[in-house]
Amino acid sequence: MKENINVMNVNTANRSGRSGTMTSSGLWSKIRSHRLGLSTFDIKMIGVVLMVVDHIHQMFATQGAPNWLDWFGRPVATLFFFVSVVGFSHTHSKKAYMVRLYVCMVVMAVLDVVLQQVVNYDGAQLVNNIFRDLFIGTIFMAAVDCFEAAFKKQGNKAASGFGAGVRGGDERTGSAHGVMGRNAVAASVDGASVSVQAAMPASRHAGSVTRGFRVKKTVEGVLLLALPFLLSLVLLPFMAQGDGAQTPVMIWVLRVLTAVDPAILLAENTVMVLLIPVMYALRNVKHSLVWQSVAIAVVAVCYAFAGQTQWMMIFAVIPILLYNGAKGRGDKYFFYIFYPAHIAVLYVLASLI
């Protein structure tokens, strides 16, 4: 199944080239035609494998798991962000997509708490919840949709209204030709004049509707962009209290809030989640994969200057640039099941060793 995404614009293979020689344009042509390259499913599976290695390090670090295992996980979030951008762009129902991620976010948050209460393994702290990051990303992408709807070219509704009025006048003029005979020309002029006057108020009304729509969509976009930040403010009074100052009631209220609140303050990858709306906004530009990779590289450079190993996220651009626009295998619910399952299994195993 193809997904219509603006992948790299490529030329066809050089037909005049010598036999057996693969030109760069021919390579990109084959990637785009799905004979080479990676599908959405392939990129997701690369992320899953790297994620498991990273979480092995997380759960078994106190048992001597080498620190370099953590490096494998640095591109993972970026790969999942990219897959989410593609998925949100092509889903049949964005609302259902968001609801599904939100439910998984809450379930994963509850599972983290239950595992730590029941297993009580001190070697790893469970804060894993990629679903929260992805759901926050969908809020931001919905904001981008609002801005795109507000600022895209609507077409000249006033002109179309004017044209409709003139055509209406012509039709009325045509009937006048049959009735009035020799006064047809005068009727035509009068009819057109009346239609123009009738069209002008409709034209102004269409313009006001368009302006109102744009204002509405712009406001919706701003509110959606601000929402994950505003929801973070709800948590601050609880987090300001020291561990010893929190009552049992406050602790449980905080646990409930952290389960249901899509606050960017709680995101596993914090502000890196902002990569999602950036990549989403770039999805339809020419050479979109290149520009999305540039955005990733900019963030990676920032982490490099900060001295953090997260700069290794730059390696995510390799599979992203090889994306061929194909969906690949379905397995719609695989990740929703595998992610919490592998966290639980690794956490329990680590507690038993």
What are these regions (language model features)?
Residues 1-353:
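Alpha-helical transmembrane segments and their immediate juxtamembrane cytosolic regions
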